[in-house]
Amino acid sequence: IARADSYDGPLADVLQSQFEHFRPHVPVAGKRVLLKPNLVEYHKAKVINTDPRFVGAVIELFKREGAAEIVVAEGPGHWRNVQFLVNESGLGDVLRAHGVRFVDLNHDEPVKTLNLGRMTGLDHLYLSQTVLSADVFVSLPKLKTHHWAGATLSLKNLFGTLPGICYGWPKNELHWRGIPHSIVDIALTHTPHLAVVDGIVGMEGDGPLNGTAKPVGAVVMGADLVAVDATCCRLMKLPPERLPTLAMAAMKRLGRIREAEIPQLGEPVAALATAFEWPPKVEKQLLTAEQAATAS
């Protein structure tokens, strides 16, 4: 965890200091790097998406690290006119300034891939060729609550990697199969190498679209996405053990959820933790304390 109070500060320097700990495990020099931000909808007064300045700082980081190519890609679940969304959100300006191309994953070439999770009952998943062909795959979510999942972080962000031409808008079949089940299947089938969470300003309340801005001043980076998301929940003072996605992911050995088992560097959670307002009626979507204890 690193402290970053503003998007206008030296974010690339902050990220580079964090990445020192991950360079041996996630080498990017000479590699093709795919960045997957959270780009859902654009509303001028809301903090729905990974901030374009944050994406720009991550691009700068990997340029410094010697990446051969950097691609930003997303398959939004709501808007079909993705290029309009990219431009209106401000992401287009950032990508043009850095000379980085954007790929609409909703219309990317689907690749039939053996489902390694099998939580949904699906034998195969159709993944994006652009995602599968990347040497380094990075999830760049926004720190947000979610009215169905409890929180939407680096794992939930993977919904946008599956082509809409196969799964519909908003990835209907995956919702019918169960959001936690689908997330875990996707993550086990093609696991990102790194997560970098935009927690400078998050969203609390009725996320992922209708919540309110919540300044936190944190950037969270990690190679274990379950640990990253559990840590982000603790920053939001949400109980990660009660989120079905994280409980299920830990059960499937995708990563670590217990705080005592997560090697934590940088700022301590307590230094930046701030209570987020929960989404209305989200209790119905969470595990009870008893269920969480049994699952763990």
Outline where the language-model segments fall:
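N-terminal and secondary-structure boundary signal
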Residues: 1-296
